[in-house]
Amino acid sequence: MAERVQSERQSSHPTSFTGNHPHLEKIHQKLHHAKVEIVHFKHSIGKLGNIVNPNHRHDEEHEQEVDRKRSEIAESHRFESFAPIREGHLAKFYIDGRDYFWALATALESAKEVIYIADWWLSPELFLRRPPAYSENDRVDTILKRRAEAGVKIYIIVYKEVEAALTCNSQHTKHALHELCPKGSPGHGNIRVMRHPDHNVFDRGGDMTFYWAHHEKYCVIDHELAFIGGLDICFGRWDLKQHPLADVHPETVRNEIWPGQDYNNNRIMDFQNVEDWKQNQLSKTEYGRMPWHDVALAIRGRSVLDIAQHFVETWNHAKRDKYKRDGRYDWLQLEWAEDDILGVQHPRFPVGDYIKHPLHPLNKEKMEKLGKVTTQLVRSSADWSHGILTEHSIQNAYQEVIRNAKHYVYIENQFFITATGEKQKPIINTIGAAIVDAITTAHSENRKFRVIVIIPLVPGFAGDLRDKGANGTRAIMDYQYKSMFRGEHSICGILKGKGIDPVKYISFFSLRSYDRLNRTERIEKKEERTGVKYEDVQHAQAHEVMSEEGVTGGHGYGKDESVQYHMQKDREAFEKDQKEDKPHDKETKDSIAQDALKSSRRPSEEGFQGDEELEKENIVTEQCYIHAKVLIADDKIAIIGSSNLNDRSQLGYHDSELSIVIEDQNTVDAKMDGEDFKASYFAAHLRRQLWREHLGLLPPQDLDASGDPNATLPGEGDYDFQEDERSRIVEDPLNDELWDTWNRQAHDNTNIFRELFHCIPDNAVKTFEDYDKFLPKEEIKAGHLFNPEMPLKEVKKKLDGIRGHLVRFPTEFLIDEEMAERGLDFNEITESIYT
């Protein structure tokens, strides 16, 4: 049991007065209760005054004293972070969802006392291992339910979205998780979920925050192990290194990988009604999913306690701001930190208990000697998100690491919006200035130096970029272009003004994937014979695997047994029908995405059970959505976390973020521009594995990671880098042969995708008139072949030429147009939302 530290509560009455008068005692208790209610009501009303006093958490003497203490702590640390540099860690990186979620499932199952989870979005129905039909015990809610029933205390903070703008439905998350252990059942009360911030001051008296989000993604287990990175525990994130687009399985829908809402393409359609997680309005037989590329890591060591402290500070801030008079939510205390630093309050009449963590004695000395990885937590936090003065140590870390780089800076990020100075308003963060400084210094020293940036081709929001509704998306793209290479104040513009050729020093790339939907003649014949549509069979399968007994459907979302019965009957009838009009001697794979990696086959060698026209209809492409937030410099240092490269993530007082700086004291003998070099094991191998994936030098992944050391926890086995002679080309990041290969593959892949699909955005589209001419005909579905008349043999031969997923970022897209029009949705008041 947790140590419950009871606060001092005012005695309800003198013992000598009531001891022999039970009737008077009851009256006095009622009067005392009424007094408490009046005090609470008075304070609730008093909070309305905060509307006109945005500094209300920092204007009293005791609050200013706490601010002073926090500032002194931060000023004594590198990057002015709340956390110091700490040594002696074990660390493990995870690239893409399979490895990360596999390891997370292992860790959650091992929890004995306490779990902290912070997410922008959390889907209780998410399967951490695949395929779901064979991994029924590996769903998030089933794991958390088991741990809660075993006595583990689970604390979760999720972003409370503005419902008009986002569809993640945190209310469903909260109610679904709270109802896992109803009153009277084992584990009741062991799962507590907070939603923050509020958007209505009259709701619970909390501050109103409309524009900014809790964007962190991290998990702490028993104060011994932590996960941190770019992956929310939610739909749409689970993926493999080959980044498949297809999930159609003629043999049996039990082989489906992404059931229900988990199959998503944000460029075509945003998530819809996620509380009805079994359904999906995006047809798997017509459209490919949007693959998801991400990076995270797990650590053991002293910095785990810093992540725990960040969580507890956020929890107590939300408790004070929103749940102060809700007895279901306790104040959290930590053994190693003072209450005032943690934001713990001791009101006269407290509601909820005071719980001190961890529940077991800490051996800090042992935690500091586990390995040789040095780490430091950095964050973006401020008054609205954390109850503190603004901290932007993530931006400080980015700037310092970039300026100190001697050989290269490699960035993967969801966005790239930054300024080189004060002349790019409304953009404020100056990471761009640090990039200019690093390149300028290298140029003056005649030193080879490269900045390589990989970002999505287009932000992951639904809609045709020509539509008025896409004005916000175009605004983001416009800010990115003006940060990178458009205008005299962009990074490239500043460099040109200094007489420096930017092409020599900085390059921008993206990722794209292809696949073939496995809608075969066999499926069509089955539909004819049974009268059951394949989409209905998929819905039935999703209903079966996502509606296990003992797992609640959440707030108001119970199961309809009659509907379920008929759905399962249809599915059984469809799958029992094994008749064939004619035998097929061709093997048809459910996905051919693996052919872009180190595979034994190429697309031209793939068989298909159907005619050529049907196969052509099934060939699709989509951008591989880069959601990673990674910076690596000189094979020495890495920054990984939740922070995008834009104002929202970097300023501190907009979105809240948490990232970690990694420096591994384990070194490897390496090369840098042909010279002998001592590289950091962690940073060098993270970069190499990312580049091998992007260049197609890795083999595809299986769904099952049970024997893969890349999906284990820190300290439980080394990586398997699957190296061969060809893949070693990435070892020297400044190798000219590598750079030639990188650019050639990006160029070739870009041209092939352009010829086959006419993908938007593209350098051939400089005006909206070009856009109209370039786009496929209206009857061509999004992501399908541009020219249906091209012979199949020619299509597949061209696909053979695609290696990996690397493509060039289109620097000239709509260069002759004003991309963002000022109006109601985009103006001086709202423009900071898009930066």
Located regions from the model:
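Compact beta-rich and alpha/beta scaffold cores in large eukaryotic transport/transcription complexes
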Residues: 456, 654-656, 662-666, 670-671
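Long mid-to-C-terminal assembly/interaction modules of large eukaryotic proteins
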Residues: 515-516, 524-526, 532-549, 558, ...
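HKD-type phospholipase D/PLD-like phosphodiesterase module
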Residues: 71-114, 118-401, 412, 418-419, ...
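Ordered core of a single globular domain
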Residues: 413, 428, 435-436
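N-terminal alpha-helical scaffolding segments that mark the starts
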Residues: 24-27, 58-59, 67-75, 82-85
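Long, serine/threonine/proline-rich intrinsically disordered regions in eukaryotic cortical polarity
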Residues: 2-59
